[in-house]
Amino acid sequence: TCVMDINPIKYLGAKPVYVDIEPNTFNMNPALLEGKITSKTKIIVAQHTYGYPCDMDAITEIAAKRGIVVIEDCCLSFGSTYKGKTVGMFGKAAYFSFQWNKPFTTGLGGMAITNDADLAEKIKGLCDSDLCMPSAKEVLMLTAQLAVYRMFIYPRTTALAQNIFRYLTKKGAVVGSSS
């Protein structure tokens, strides 16, 4: 997924361990999860990919048996549900990135949710600090990313580029999916 999932683990001196995916959902394969758990395992990060929720029944059952905390990465599945329950409601906490390349974006930033009052207070403490304010470099980067998005990725621009590509393909100037 993203370095933002792994870096906090590494910053704490822990070692991230990856579990292979299910080919139909691109989510963690719960059948392989238990084999990756050791006595050092503290957290399972369940990433819901491309709008497909993980098998949260299996993941939370494995975690509960071992006393392991589950945190959900909901960045790519904003609004998705698993068995009638919205993603982000299964673990101790969940987070949603609103970075420019996510399905739901504010450019930068994100959201964390939890049903744990102590953890909620710690998260609020982080938000009250200067850690949540973008630096001048980040503001400049965001401005540049927005300009690139508007120029090259914006739907009208993309449609124009596709039409030009199709035209050039028909004329034999390029080889592509329309040839």
List the predicted regions and their residue ranges.
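PLP-dependent aminotransferase-like
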Residues: T1-T81
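Hydrophobic alpha-helical segments
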Residues: C2-D5, T60, G91, G107, ...
